[in-house]
Amino acid sequence: MPSDILVVAALGRPFTLGMLYDARNDKLIPGFTLWEDEVIEESTVESSQPSSAFEIIASDSIDDKSSLMEIEASLKASFLGGLVEVGGSAKYLNNQKKFKNQSRVTLQYKATTNFKQLMTNLGTKHVEYSELFENIQATHVVIGILYGANAFFVFDSNKVDSTNVQEIQGQMEAVIKKIPSVEISGKASVQLTSEETDITNSFSCEFHGDFFLTSNPTTFEDAVKTYQQLPQMMGKDNAVPMTVWLVPMVNFYSEAPQLMADSSTPILRKVRNTLEAIVQVQMRCNDALDDPTVNLFTEVQKKLSDFQIICDDHMSKLQATIAKKLFAIRSGDEDESALVNLFEENLQSPFNTESLNMWMEFEEREINVLKSCMDILTKAKPKVIFNQGVLFKELYDSKVKHGLCYVFTNVTKNDDFLTVLNDFLDSPQSRPKKLRPSPKDYWYSYDDIPEMMREKAHLFRNLAKEMNNRCVHFFVTAINNPKQEGAGIHYYRESIQIIHEFTKPHMPGVETIKDRRELQWYDCELTLDTETAHQVLTLSEGNKRQCRGVRVTRRSLREFSHFQQVMCHQGAEWTPLLGVRVAGHVSAGVTYKGISRKTSTPDSSLGKNQKSWVFEYTKKSGYQQIHNGKNARVTVSSIGFKQLGVYLDWPAGTLSFYIGQQSLGDSSPHLPHQILRGCLSSLPDWGCTTESQWSN
C-alpha cells in the first residue's frame, strides 16, 4: 500500500498538479508543491477526453450516490466520518430526504473534457523545499487530473402515505426519463399527458452542479430548460477536477509519512450501515414532527425535537471518533479492531439503532392515539386550546356559564429514556440505567387506556352534538395529571371546576331547583321554521325573531293556514330549556309534529287539542296555561316579564314554564317563577303562536 498510486474523486475540492495530499485523513495541503511552477508547467502533458452521459436513480443511499460519483470505499468512509468537506456538485452527497415517507428520483448529467498529467520522470532532482518536508504531513502528490463537470437534479415528492412511496417514485421516474430525450435546440419541451403534468406539478427540484447558473431550477420545467443548456456550457474553461491520481511521497522523499493500511470492506460497511441507520431514524423523526397532530401537542413536539438534537449530537461524536480511528489505522498506529470495538460499544449503548427505533415506535403510537381522539373530538367543533393560560382566560369569559373540557391528562414532555440518552452523551463511560425504552413507561403502549380515551371522546362529541346552548362551551386541552389516566371530561361552572369525570348532566326535580344557573345548562338556541309560519308572520335575525307582516313567499304544505303560529326547526331530542324574549301577547309551548296545519278547528290551534301544551299571556286575560282547550289561570308573584323559559324534561315526562325579568343566560342566580308542571307521554316539537313579537 505505501507505494500504490491512489485514484480518488475530487468531490469539488480545488486540486492542482503538484499539490500535496494526506491520504490518512483525505486532506489537501495547500500552499506547497514539490516543484516550481515553471517546472510543473513544462512537465505537464494534456490530452483531450470528451465524453458525456446521464444516469437516473431512484435511491437515496450513500452507496448509490457514491457509485454515481465514482467514490471508492476508503474515501466514502472518510466522507461518512466527516473528514471530507465536499463542494460543487459533490454537495449532492449531503442532500438527504427529509422524510422517510417521501419519493425521490435523481437525474445525473456527467461530462469530461480533458486530462492533465505530470511526467513522472521528474524524479527528485527537481524537488524544491525538501528542508520543509519534515513538518509537512503529506503522504501523496497530485500527478494527474481528469477535468469535467457533474450536475444532479434531485426531484422530491411531498410527504406521502407510506403505502404510496414506491408507486409515486415509479411515476416520477417514468416522467424524468423523458428529460434526456429533449433535443438540444432553441426550445426545450417534454410532451406530457395531463396525468404526467399533474405528477410534475407535485414535486420539487434541487440542483447541485459544477456549472454556474444565474438561477437554479426548482421545478420540472426549469430542470428541462437547464438540462438542455448544460452541453453548451461545457468546455475546458468551465471544467473542474473530477478524478485525481496520487503518487506516494516516498517516491520523492524517503522520510515522508506513508499510508500504511486501510480498513477492510466489512469494517467500512459497518461504518456506512451504522451512520445510515441513524439517518433513517432522523428521517422517521422528521416524519413525526411534520404530523399536524404533533403541532397541536407542544409536549410531544418538544420530546421529538429533543430526540432529534440528541441523535444529531450522537452522530457528530460518532463521526469524530470514526475519523480519529481511520487516521490511526491508516497511520499504522492501530489496527482495524479499533473500529470493531467502537461499533461493539455502540451496540451495547442506549444509542443502538434497535433502541432508537423502538423509542420512535412508542412515540408514533402516542401520536396515533392522540390523532384518533382528535379526529373524533373535532367533529364536536370545540375550541382547541393547549395553552393553559389561554384556556382559563376563556373559562373566565362571562359568556361561558358552563364549560366542558376534554383533557388529555398524560401528555408530557418528560421521558425517562431521553434522560438516559442525554446522560450517556455527557458521560459515555458511565453505566446507563437502561439500554432500551420499556413499554411500562408509556401509557399508550397498552390498549385499555387508548380505548377508554376514544370512548370519552365519543361521549364528548355526542354531548356537543346534542346541545345547541349559548351558555355551554366546549374545549379540548392537555393538562398533565398522573392521577387521571389518559383523559377526562372536566366540567366547569362559571370558571370553577365542578366535576373531573363528567358523563352526563344531572338535573334535579324541577320543583327543587333553587338556582337559575342549574337551568342555564339546558338553555338552547332554536330557529323558527319558515315552512310552518303563517303568512302574516315575518321571520328575521336568522329566523330567531318573528313579528307580524305579510310575507311574499310561495305557500308551503307544512305552514299553518288559519292560525298565526310557527314551529321551530329543532325537535326536542333531550331536555332543552327554550328561552323566549317576549313583548306583548305571547303564547309558547310544545306540540307534536303531527298537529293539523290547514284547518280552522281546534285541531290546528296550539293548546286547544291533546297534541299541544301552551303558556299564554295577554293584558286582558293575564297568565294562563292551556291544554286540550282547557284554560287554567296562573297566579304569579310579580306582573310582567321579559323572558319565558320552557323546560321540557322528556325522559321524566315533565313540562315546566318559568318567567323572569332577566334573560336565562344572565349571571344572576335568581330563579324565574315555575308556573306549570304537566305530564307528557311522548316526544313533541317546539311551537309558538303570537299576536305581537317573539324571539329566542
UniProtKB/Swiss-Prot annotation:
Glycosylated. This is Verrucotoxin subunit beta. This lethal (towards mice) toxin induces hemolytic, cytolytic and hypotensive activities. Inhibits calcium channels and may activate ATP-sensitive potassium channels in frog atrial heart muscle. In guinea-pig ventricular myocytes, it modulates calcium channel activity through the beta-adrenoceptor-cAMP-PKA pathway (ADRB). One of its GO terms (cellular component) is extracellular region. Tetramer composed of 2 alpha and 2 beta subunits. It comes from Synanceia verrucosa (Reef stonefish). The keyword RNA-binding does not apply. Belongs to the SNTX/VTX toxin family. GO terms for biological process: killing of cells of another organism. It is found in: Secreted. One of its GO terms (molecular function) is calcium channel regulator activity. Pfam families: MACPF_SNTX (PF24674), SPRY (PF00622), Stonustoxin_helical (PF21109), Thioredoxin_11 (PF18078). PANTHER family: AIG1-TYPE G DOMAIN-CONTAINING PROTEIN, SI:CH211-281L24.3. The keyword Secreted applies. Expressed by the venom gland. Keywords: Calcium channel impairing toxin, Cytolysis, G-protein coupled receptor impairing toxin, Glycoprotein, Hemolysis, Ion channel impairing toxin, Neurotoxin, Potassium channel impairing toxin, Secreted, Toxin. Its main location: secreted. Residues 506-696 form the B30.2/SPRY domain.
